[in-house]
Amino acid sequence: MNIKASRIKELETLCKNIREEILRVVSKNGGHLSSTLGATEIIVAMHEVFDSKKDPFIFDVSHQSYAHKLLTGRWDKFDTLREFNGLCGYTKPSESEHDYFVAGHSSTSISLGVGAAKAIALKGEQNSRIPVIMIGDGSMTAGMVYEALNELGERKYPMVIILNDNEMSISKPIGAISRILSSAMASPFYQNFKKHTENFVDNFGDGARYIAKRMEESLKLITPGIMFEEMGIDYIGPVDGHNIASLIEILQKAKELKKPVIVHAQTLKGKGYEIAEGKDEKWHGVGPFDLDSGAASKKSSAKSATQIYAEALLHLAKNNDKIVGATAAMPSGTGLSELIELYPNRFWDVAIAEQHAVTSMAALAKEGFKPFCTIYSTFLQRGYDQVIHDTCLMNLPVVFALDRAGIVGEDGETHQGVFDVSFLRAIPNMTLFAPRDEKSFHQAMAFAAQYQFPCSLRYPRGSFTQTSLPESSPFELAKSQLLQSNKGDVLFIGYGNGVGRAYETSKLLEEKISILDLRFIKPLDKEMLRDMATKHNKWFIFSDSAKMGGVGSAILEFFADEKILHVELESFEYEDSFITHGKTKDVEESLGLLPAQLAQKVKALI
């Protein structure tokens, strides 16, 4: 493919302008930065060779798709990135016809590509359409990728898979697969070749050394592709992911092959922003920052729930060598980085492998250890069968610590942690509880550490809602805490961070209100609930979880069992819909869940 030099110059300028716009907006709004900057030339080349209106453009996770948004008619709206009612930080078909599929969770792209390729074949459109996938090296650590590659290699559907290799998942990529992709020279085949060749050529002089050197350089290029070639998928690379002319030429050749091809492109994370170039996970996802210095624009004064969890777990681990733990590619986000560094034989980042994380922790529990499986609420969805089959069926004492429970803000629909109460409550042998503040969190962790059955505790992104309620008492199984007692008809029941919302709402009302920290949703404190039913006949539930199957549902089931018919119950949980992105306050306001809005609803109902 002969591309005019003038066109290449135009595209290089376009890449520069795209990076400048991404930096300008992300420094203001926050967002995903390093991988986005690094992927710019790849995305521009994709749009030069393929047609995103007809060719399915599939971005794995899609947090690196900002350049794609800018190239598909959204430049004038890019200022609204991740804002409420603005552009989503991920691909979203309802936002643009150029976005093929919703994304946000890792390692789904190749399966989507296989499905799209099957549909294209069934429609007889293989001469006019081809799936184009961009996937990062971090996503290549998840098993779903290899399930898809396994079928793809067998069926040979035409597809171009661009492996964006910047050696950067959210944290350092973990495992054998990452080593294959990031360091061909580390392979035993290559090392053995080098060792034996050096011994051999010593006897044959400079000519043999020259030939051996050329063979060695060739093997550096061949080794990463062996795995894919053995699966039946053509491999091209590694190639320079920032050479726009080369990328266009290679993608055109890959397109013309009419079979599955992996193009291995090596990129520099943070490309174009010197402060972030090649840096670690700090620049993966960022809040607003000063573009000149790179300093964060503002820092929260309140301690985050994640920090509290990390401190509590560290304290427990120092005093009990049976405590172990795992996270799935989120050591920094979940607060486990320090524990992994201090106790590398007891705490592990297992890569993007939630199923494996859950089941491996179950085996540790079987062997007498006390595992803390630390995962974002939204990502435990990916290990649900393992929670049921490998943990609860065996009744093993694994603690599931669910970070980012509730609304997570700008990451939106794919990341909201609202379903865990509903999907975990249905599992036999599972105990569910939640702290409301820092002290109760430490007490909840102390309870979890000694509990001999499966359990889960949830906590929000950011800090807990601050209150002046009475101090928390130690956690006991199925025991709630009455925080405020009055003789009126109204009872507010809070669960987890919902306790703070209940308290803030109560301050806006003139009525005398009792407030109960439920603490345990499974099992419920039936004795306390029976007593409350004799004193209050208007109950209001506050929880940052889904209404369907949630806290209100659990209490209504209790009413049905106990034949309690006189209590009126209203639940302020999330309705049956996916929750959009935006600052948490803006999203909650749109749902009518700010304290002032809730106070008005309560007034209307009492």
Curated annotation (Swiss-Prot):
Pathway(s) annotated for this protein in UniProt: Metabolic intermediate biosynthesis; 1-deoxy-D-xylulose 5-phosphate biosynthesis; 1-deoxy-D-xylulose 5-phosphate from D-glyceraldehyde 3-phosphate and pyruvate: step 1/1
UniProt-listed InterPro entries: Dxylulose-5-P_synthase (IPR005477), THDP-binding (IPR029061), Transketo_C/PFOR_II (IPR009014), Transketolase-like_Pyr-bd (IPR005475), Transketolase_BS (IPR020826), Transketolase_C (IPR033248)
One Gene Ontology cellular component: cytosol
Pfam families for the chain: DXP_synthase_N, Transket_pyr, Transketolase_C
A biological-process GO annotation: terpenoid biosynthetic process
Note on cofactor: Binds 1 Mg(2+) ion per subunit.
Keyword Ligase: no
Keywords: Isoprene biosynthesis, Magnesium, Metal-binding, Thiamine biosynthesis, Thiamine pyrophosphate, Transferase
The protein's enzyme class: transferase
UniProt binding sites for thiamine diphosphate: H63, G104, H105, S106, G138, S139, N166, Y273, E354
Binding site for Mg(2+): D137, N166
Cofactor field: Mg(2+); thiamine diphosphate
Domain of life of the organism encoding this protein: Bacteria
Molecular functions per Gene Ontology: 1-deoxy-D-xylulose-5-phosphate synthase activity; magnesium ion binding; thiamine pyrophosphate binding
Keyword Transferase: yes
EC number per UniProt: 2.2.1.7
Extent of the signal sequence: none
Catalysed reactions, semicolon-separated: D-glyceraldehyde 3-phosphate + pyruvate + H(+) = 1-deoxy-D-xylulose 5-phosphate + CO2
NCBIfam families, per database record: dxs (TIGR00204), PRK05444.2-2 (NF003933)
Description of how the protein assembles with itself and partners: Homodimer.
Function: Catalyzes the acyloin condensation reaction between C atoms 2 and 3 of pyruvate and glyceraldehyde 3-phosphate to yield 1-deoxy-D-xylulose-5-phosphate (DXP).
HAMAP family, per the entry: DXP_synth
Family: Belongs to the transketolase family. DXPS subfamily.
Protein name in the entry: 1-deoxy-D-xylulose-5-phosphate synthase
Primary gene name: dxs
